[in-house]
């Protein structure tokens, strides 16, 4: 189109009347040139592909012939397999447990009839003794063997039938329980396992079985009435294991510089043995009094009891009707004796708060 812009009207009229010039102008256009180039490139590509395919022609023919041979071999193998399968079906039908059982029964009856016939001939005198002894024993042995085989084969035939009947009579398995959908916002609930019962006596003891040890777990709530007197025992505190402060000396006056009041002093009790001087030490009382105090007031380890036991006695619980009452007065469970040299006074109340 650009070449036609520069031409005059007369040249355009001449070009219109000249068909060769129009054809030349069309061939020289860039669009036609591009198409021509693409055509030449496609022809070259097709030529190269054709040459490459011709190179694979020989291996392709060889592979085709091999495939044909293998196919013929496959057909022969299929025919042979069909023949072997027919033979196997024929033999298997003859060797079925039911068929074998029938054949064994027939042969067993046959050999038994032959042996009976020989015995009858021997009794009639038609068969000599030597022939009868040789043949009759072998016949009877074969008859017994076949009878045993028939019995065993009958057991083998019955077992699969019994198993099939049991499998048919068995109920179908139960489906698993459906899973309940849990909302997304709700946390999963964990089921608590029941705890095993504690190995503890049904009723706690009315007294402490070990007075020198700390008090164990106490009973909560009222306990049922017991048929024996209930008392409580004090629990003594053994004190710290290390050296303690020396006790104050008994008497109107203590150590120098310390005034001792009568309320803090207690005369020695009669009946308690004294401690030798050589056995005294830090934390141990001396004979005839207590160790001098370094300035701290000390309390007496033995409270004034006034002739009563150092532990309280609890009143007897109400007993069941018809139960005999004790004729002797109540006594503490432990006999009174020398109290330990150390310890704190017993608690004012009973040791068991549940009573």
UniProtKB/Swiss-Prot annotation:
Q: Which UniProt keywords apply?
A: Endosome, Membrane, Phosphoprotein, Protein transport, Transport
State the SUPFAM superfamilies in the record. Answer: Endosomal sorting complex assembly domain
Low complexity compositional bias: what residue ranges? 291-304
Gene3D superfamilies per the record?
Answer: Helix hairpin bin
Which Pfam family is one of those matched by this entry? Mod_r
| Modified how | Phosphorylated by TBK1.
Sorted alphabetically, the Gene Ontology cellular component annotations on this record are: cilium; endosome membrane; ESCRT I complex; extracellular exosome; Golgi apparatus; intracellular membrane-bounded organelle; late endosome membrane; nucleoplasm
Q: Which residues form the VPS37 C-terminal domain?
A: 78-167
Q: Which cysteines are joined by disulfide bonds?
A: none
- Tell me the segments the record calls region Disordered: 159-355
Q: Where is the composition biased (Pro residues)?
A: 170-186, 194-214, 321-355
Q: Care to name a GO molecular-function term for this sequence?
A: calcium-dependent protein binding
Q: List, in alphabetical order, the GO biological process terms annotated in this UniProt record.
A: macroautophagy; membrane fission; multivesicular body assembly; protein targeting to membrane; protein targeting to vacuole; protein transport to vacuole involved in ubiquitin-dependent protein catabolic process via the multivesicular body sorting pathway; ubiquitin-dependent protein catabolic process via the multivesicular body sorting pathway; viral budding via host ESCRT complex
Query: Keyword Phosphoprotein on this protein?
Result: yes
Provide the protein's localization.
Late endosome membrane
Q: How does it sit in the membrane?
A: Peripheral membrane protein
Q: Which residues carry this modification: Phosphoserine?
A: 29
Q: Which family does it belong to?
A: Belongs to the VPS37 family.
Q: How does it assemble?
A: Component of the ESCRT-I complex (endosomal sorting complex required for transport I) which consists of TSG101, VPS28, a VPS37 protein (VPS37A to -D) and MVB12A or MVB12B in a 1:1:1:1 stoichiometry. Interacts with TSG101, VPS28, MVB12A and MVB12B. Component of the ESCRT-I complex (endosomal sorting complex required for transport I) which consists of TSG101, VPS28, a VPS37 protein (VPS37A to -D) and UBAP1 in a 1:1:1:1 stoichiometry. Interacts with HGS and STAM2. Interacts with CEP55.
Function (record text): Component of the ESCRT-I complex, a regulator of vesicular trafficking process. Required for the sorting of endocytic ubiquitinated cargos into multivesicular bodies. May be involved in cell growth and differentiation.
What PANTHER family does this protein's entry cite?
A: VACUOLAR PROTEIN SORTING-ASSOCIATED PROTEIN 37, VACUOLAR PROTEIN SORTING-ASSOCIATED PROTEIN 37C
Report what the protein is called: Vacuolar protein sorting-associated protein 37C
Species assigned in the record: Homo sapiens (Human)
Q: What is the lineage of its organism?
A: Eukaryota, Metazoa, Chordata, Craniata, Vertebrata
What gene is it encoded by? VPS37C
